Amino acid sequence: MATPHHPRRGDTRRRIQEVALALFAEQGYEKTSLREIAERLDVTKAALYYHFKTKEDILSSIAEDLAQPIRDLLAWAEGQPRTLATKQEVLRRYSDILWHSADLFRFIQENQASVRELTIGETFKTSTAALGDLMKDPGAPLAAQVRSVTALFSMHAGMFVMRNVEGDPEEKRAAILEVALDLVAQAETNLSVN
């Protein structure tokens, strides 16, 4: 006799996160209610409330899922020498993180005013600043420091700007990474010239 399939708690949590993020992106964080999220999921508000008490709880859980890979990247990078190869590997790994969390990063960029007021805003700001610090050499000429940090931020801007450009998403991702790698290599080249 077949047993009925009951979604595991983690599956429900993940579905709530996906639906909420889609609604936040469609109509904005402020304009989305828990009731709308529950309706889209075809569950009661009480069932949704069992998993998350507020919209911020949902968003914080999504951000926490993203924060761990970034913390792992920071921990790895802090144990490495600040060489061009390390910086390039940071960019490659960060590209993977961005790629797998593209919807969240788009949401953050499109809802900056709302995000700034939430815990996720501070978390994102802190981890991005830490990555930026790892990318630059404090004793380097200012132009080299700017190039190194711009390499990181060009990946954010590239994701946002290139999303409406025709083409294969993987090719766009590769092109964005190529530009970031070029910027950090140029920063290192300027260091060896000076």
Please describe what each predicted stretch is.
Residues M1-G10, T189-N194:
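Actinobacteria-biased recognition of intrinsically disordered, low-complexity terminal regions
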Residues V19-E26, P69-W76, S154-V161:
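Solvent-exposed, amphipathic alpha-helical segments
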Residues S61, D72-L104:
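Hydrophobic alpha-helical connector segments
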Residues R92-W99, E110-S114, L134-M135:
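Helix-loop "lid/cap" segments that line or gate small-molecule binding pockets
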Residues F105-R106, E110, E117-N194:
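Hydrophobic/aromatic-rich alpha-helical bundle segments in the mid-to-C-terminal region
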